[in-house]
Curated annotation (Swiss-Prot):
EC number: 2.7.13.3
Processing and modification events after translation: FMN binds covalently to cysteine after exposure to blue light and this bond is spontaneously broken in the dark.
Modified residues (Phosphohistidine): H173
S-4a-FMN cysteine: modified positions: C85
Alphabetized SMART domains for the sequence: HWE_HK, PAC
Organism: Erythrobacter litoralis (strain HTCC2594)
Name of one Pfam family that matches: HWE_HK
Protein known as: Blue-light-activated histidine kinase 1
HWE histidine kinase domain: annotated span: 260-303
Amino acid sequence: MPLKGEISAQAGREFDTSRLDLRAIIDPRDLRVDPTRLFLETTQQTRLAICISDPHQPDCPVVYVNQAFLDLTGYAREEIVGRNCRFLQGADTDPEQVRKLREGIAAERYTVVDLLNYRKDGIPFWNAVHVGPIYGEDGTLQYFYGSQWDITDIVAERRKAETQRRIAAELRHRTGNIFAVLNAIIGLTSRRERDVSEFADKLSERVSALASAHRMTIMDEPDQEAVAIDDLVTGVMKPYRNRFAERVTTSGPKIELGPRSVTALGLALHELATNAVKYGALSVDAGRVEISWSREDGDVTLVWQEQGGPTVSQEQSEPVKGNGTMLIDGMIASLTGSIERDFAAAGLQAKITLPVHQPE
C-alpha cells in the first residue's frame, strides 16, 4: 500500500518530462497527421486529467483541458478555461501542499503534490497533481502543464490500514492494562478471604464492574478517545438506581475522560455503591446518595455524598483498609489522582480527583 509521499514520488517519476526532448524522438516530417491534431486527439483520449495554463496572462489561467479533466472535476470546459486552477481547492485543502505547488511554479520546477480538491457538486477527491513548465525553442517559459491523477481510493485504503493498525495497537495496550487490573483484583480479593463462596462472589462483582467500565471505553468511532463522565456514572450506577429509584441522584457538567481514568473511576464507584448497600446510606430506607462532579483546570473532582444512613461511630470513622479500598486507592494513585474519605456522622463523603487527560 503506497503512502502519501510514495504516491507523489511515483507520479513524479512517471510524469517528469524535464529530460525529454520531443524533437529528438518525433520528427514532424514523419507524422501522418498535423502535430496539433495529434496532440489534441491524444490528450482527449487519455484517461489522465490534463490542463495547460498560460503564465503570460494575469493569474496564469487555464487555456486548455482534456475530456478526462472535465470528467474528474464535473465542470464544463467553458467553466474552467480562463480561471486559475485554485478554484478547485476548498475548506480542507492542505495549505502546506498549496504552498509547495506555488513555490514549484514560481521556480519553474517540476512539482508533484497530493492535494484534496473539490468537484463542481462539492464532493472532495484526492489527486496527485503534477505541474511542469513547457519551454519554447528559444528556452523561454511558454506554458505550464498540469495533470491530476485521482488517488481517492488509494488514500481511503491507506487510511483504513492506518486505522486498523492503530486499533490493533490500542487493543494490545488495553488488554495489557485489563490483565494488570485483574491480577490486582484477584490478589487483593483473596488476601483476607477465608470463605471460598464469599471470595467468588466478591471477585465476580469486581470483575463485572471492571467489564462494565471497560465497555465504556470501547468507542463507536475509531478516532473517539474519551468517555463522558455522565455516561460512566449512569452505566455503573444503573443497577442501584433501578433498585433505589430516586434515592440515588447525579449532577454535573459534560466532562470527558480517557480510558484509564474511566476504569479507575468505574471501579471506585462500584466499591462505594457496594459498601453503601451493605453498610451505608443505601442499607436503610431513609438513606440516599448524591453523586456530583466538576472540573477545575485540568482535574475532574467527583464527590460521593451519603445522607440519612446509619450513624457512623468513632471506630467506623477510622477503618482498617479493606481489599477494595486498597485496590481503588492504588489505581487512583497510579493516575496521579487522589481520594479523600470523610466518615462524618451525617454520612460518608468521598472526594475523588483525577486528571482529565491521562497518557495511555
